[in-house]
Amino acid sequence: MKRILAVVAVSLSAVLTAPPALAANPHDPPGTGQPGEYRPVRGPSAPSEHRFLQKTLRGQDLPRHAYDLAAAQAARLPTTGGAWNLLGPSNIGGRVVDMALDPAHPDTLYIATASGGLWRSTDLGATFAPAWPADLTQAMGAVAAASNGTLYAGTGEANPGGGSLTYTGTGLYRSTNGGATWTGIGLADSGAIGHIAVDPRNPQRLFVAATGSLFNPGGDRGVYRSDNGGASWTRVLAGATDTTGATEVLFDPTNPQRMFAIMWDHRRQPNLRSYSGLGSGVYRSTDGGNTWQRLNSLVLPAADLGRIGVGIAPSDPRRMYAIVGRGPASSNFFDGFYTSSDGGDSWNRLPDNEDLAESQSSYAWWFAKVWVDPRNSKHVHVAGIALLTTRNGGQSWTADDDSMHVDQHAMVWDPDHPRRVYLGNDGGVYRSEANGDGGWIKSQYQPFTQFYSGAISPQDITRESGGTQDNGSLRSWGRRGWDEYVGGDGEENLINPTNVNNVFACYQYGNCFRSVDGGNSNTFFTPATTANRRNWFTPVQFDPNDPNVMYYGGNRLNRSVDNGVTWTPISPDLTGGPGQDAYPFGTITTVAAAASDPRTVWVGTDDGRVWVTSNLGATWTLRLSGQPWVTRVAVDPSSASTAYVTLSGYRAGSYQPHVLVTRDGGLSWTDLSGNLPQAPVNDVILGGGSTLYAATDQGVFVSAAGDGVWQRLGTGLPLVPVDDIEYDPGHHRLVAATFGRSMYELVI
């Protein structure tokens, strides 16, 4: 179905004249154009707002169940095309949020990934195979295995990082056949499941920490108990506020009637990140969860009390440890590390430690995990940017930030092998045979990397690269495996279509590099550009007529005619600018030069504007405004006045277009969203004839006639967000960069 958007006609047009060329200020820090702000390649910079701001509409919460409602719409569409094939990487990994060893099957390890589903290993974590249906949400929060081999999985990530957005889940699931099939068993309105605890003496008795929706109050929050293997549930501990959920439930290893629950008061509002509150705290039950008492001896209720992590020593359950985050609403700093020797009746705050504090940075809510050696009550590991370890009960600490990836989230000891420990972090799965004190071995096969972008070469179908969440910019030359060649959060990646060794890669906030030797050596070129603001994902593009001509978008558009060595601004500020409200908008998000007219360039912005110039930036005309975040502009190769625009944003209660086309240079627009799911469209590609390909949060879709009638494209692609698609018409292939399942390829 097509809709004509008459409201966005000529009346919206505005003409701006480009300013004279400005030299980059050599004293400005690279990356943001803002004095004093520099984002390091690796280190303690807080997770950005980028993904939350992109997926929501200004002033609105992310609607409850928006993701799974859109997924249901996608499932109803017919499918066309062949099978998608995994391109990789499989050796890099991605964020692991929980893990569990199967008591009934030795050496069988299950891991839950942030947006890549559930996986199983039977070879000491060396390789992993999917243990989760491809057509269910891939956003996971928890996994647990009962003594009889029954598996429980909680959906929805409980860690609110990764761009300040988590994909909500659809509740709790159970499998009795090692993950071959799964059955939903309730708590569908939980938003995210933080932890599942199964009574080691009774596999029918389990507790679930329902963390709740990050974006909406209420729902299934708190601690739930089932005495019949998940057939029915009772909430046994509710939060003190409607934004308080549970993050963890712990059994006393010697007495399963004695339990502890950690509660966290938090919410991501449209213009505020509230990650602390009066509802945060630790509770204890001595009667199997029937009643609970708050442990005020640890910390008193407070508006600035953040996320807490607790560990119990299996060899001495009276000894406990707690790490506490505290701070203003938008951040949690390290408050302190506490220990108890009487089962939580009283607590002592241990002396401050610089390594421990630095490991939590300004976002202690990203970690909040304490793991105690089952055989040594003084040997403790703590999650942080690095892995922190004490061997004397917290009196001194060492930080391991060399032998594994940053950002630790999960750990489990193998009960059959006393010194074997598994660790999960933003780089995947690691194993240590030294009790977690070094000697970490990374998994060889874990294809669940979160991609922001992809790049391919029409000259060589064995060359791919892409930017990833917390795993840098990755490359695969000749299908000989993948490696990181630029660090940080990888963003834009490009491969020159006429020279496979001329590649470009960026990390966050437009810190970009060019290379003429395939990325072996890289030259930082951002200081040569001119911008006051740069997006977390700053667009860089080749001109389709000449790859020596390039474009770089900050709040102004920059142009290079020497393959990115020197740059000249060719526009004024094309955004509404910052500071009008609490939203840090004001950057260009997409650039498209016309193949049929090298003087015509289209630009989209994060504050919903689309501009066009037909004279290489001498003047600019506003052709669309008041829209959600513009994710892509694609220009018809044969007509500079025909442009396709894709929009982000989940909306509740009313229709939101996500694909628009103009055939008259932006004087009028037609809605081509048609039967697409009501969800963000992240990219659009023009295929042969009138064919359109769209990448969305629910996969890839095709409109054969370009008329708004869409079908799901291909089989075998999991239900995972696809942030970028690349088309190689000469080899008839489409490559999808997914946010959670690495890259896939489809022959079309």
PLM feature segments, named:
Residues M1-I4:
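Positively charged n-region of N-terminal signal peptides that target proteins for export
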Residues V7-T17:
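Bacterial N-terminal signal peptides
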Residues V15-N25:
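C-terminal region of N-terminal signal peptides and the immediate post-cleavage residues
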Residues P26-I748:
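Beta-propeller blade termini and top-face loops
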